[in-house]
């Protein structure tokens, strides 16, 4: 395997580890990211996990980019980050 292929594999494994909870008490690392509305101008209701308050909160999402700590429903947020 070429060095580029190995580097890509290492990057994918690192990303997978960051997005996968270690146990039921832990949550994915992206749950620690702040709410990010992104650069677009939409006004969509979304939810993010707030690690300081240890709960999911509502925010306005612009509709593009942002980060993985953005959920369409509070249930999805809680299931992913607050469980």
Curated annotation (Swiss-Prot):
One Gene Ontology term, aspect cellular component: extracellular space
The segment(s) forming the BPTI/Kunitz inhibitor domain are 31-81
Q: State one Pfam family annotation.
A: Kunitz_BPTI
Q: Does the keyword Cytoplasm apply?
A: no
Q: Where in the cell is it found?
A: Secreted
Do you know which SUPFAM superfamilies this protein is assigned to? BPTI-like
Q: Which cysteines in this chain are paired by disulphide bridges?
A: 31-81, 40-64, 56-77
Tissue pattern of expression reads:
Expressed by the venom gland.
Task: Recite the UniProt keywords alphabetically.
Answer: Disulfide bond, Protease inhibitor, Secreted, Serine protease inhibitor, Signal, Toxin
Tree of life domain: Eukaryota
Question: Which Gene3D superfamilies does the UniProt entry name for this protein?
Answer: Pancreatic trypsin inhibitor Kunitz domain
Q: Which residues does UniProt assign to the signal peptide? A: 1-24
Coiled-coil regions listed = none
Q: Which InterPro entries match?
A: Kunitz_BPTI, Kunitz_BPTI_sf, Prtase_inh_Kunz-CS, TFPI/VKTCI-like
Single GO MF annotation? serine-type endopeptidase inhibitor activity
Which residues does the UniProt site feature Reactive bond for chymotrypsin point to?
41-42
- State the protein's purpose: Serine protease inhibitor.
Q: Which family does it belong to?
A: Belongs to the venom Kunitz-type family.
Q: What is this protein called?
A: Kunitz-type serine protease inhibitor mulgin-4
| Species in which this protein is naturally found | Pseudechis australis (Mulga snake)
């Amino acid at each position: 395997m070429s060095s580029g292929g190995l580097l890509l594999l290492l990057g994918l494994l690192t990303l997978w580890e960051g997005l996968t909870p270690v146990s039921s008490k832990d949550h994915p690392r992206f749950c620690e990211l702040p709410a990010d509305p992104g650069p677009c101008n939409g006004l969509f209701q979304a939810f993010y996990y707030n690690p300081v308050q240890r709960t999911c909160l509502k925010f306005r999402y612009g509709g593009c980019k942002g980060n993985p700590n953005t959920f369409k429903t509070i249930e999805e947020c809680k299931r992913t980050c607050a469980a």
